[in-house]
Regions:
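Polybasic, low-complexity binding patches
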Residues: 43-57, 65-107
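Acidic, low-complexity intrinsically disordered regions
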Residues: 13, 80-84, 115
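A boundary/linker detector
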Residues: 1-12, 99-102, 113, 117-120
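Zinc-coordinating Cys/His ligand positions in small cysteine/histidine-rich zinc-finger domains
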Residues: 60
Length: 120
């Protein structure tokens, strides 16, 4: 039997959220309540973004599709980004460390011109 090919992205971020292991994470990177969840590239691949966790966030499918490959800051605000990351402070599972995610993702965003002061 031929298996269908999936071009969707998966990551520990999405799988841990779906398993209910990230209960503090209720809003997506755009400030919307998480429902039909997809992996969002913070920096789109077409703009040089990588496919790794430091460039991943969770987003509702419709917003992700509407954004497509447009720059992140055309679809969200620094306040929404900071609120997104604050949901992960001190969150730790067997497979995911929220503080490391914040550190690495904000460093990656800074390298791409988006500077955030998450820690205040």
């Amino acid at each position: 039997m031929i298996q269908p090919i999936s071009f969707g992205y998966s990551s520990v971020l999405k799988s841990e959220w779906r398993k209910g292991k990230l209960p503090s994470v209720v809003k997506d990177v755009y400030g919307q309540i998480l429902e039909d969840v997809t992996i969002e590239h913070l920096i789109p691949k077409s703009l040089g973004g990588k496919s790794n966790i430091c460039n991943y966030a969770l987003a509702n499918k419709l917003t992700n599709e509407a954004r497509s490959n447009k720059p992140l800051m055309e679809f969200t605000t620094k306040e929404n980004l900071i609120a997104w990351f604050l949901q992960f402070v001190d969150v730790k599972t067997e497979k995911f460390d929220g503080n490391e995610y914040i550190k690495n993702a904000t460093k990656y965003l800074a390298k791409n011109g988006i500077k955030l002061d998450v820690w205040g």
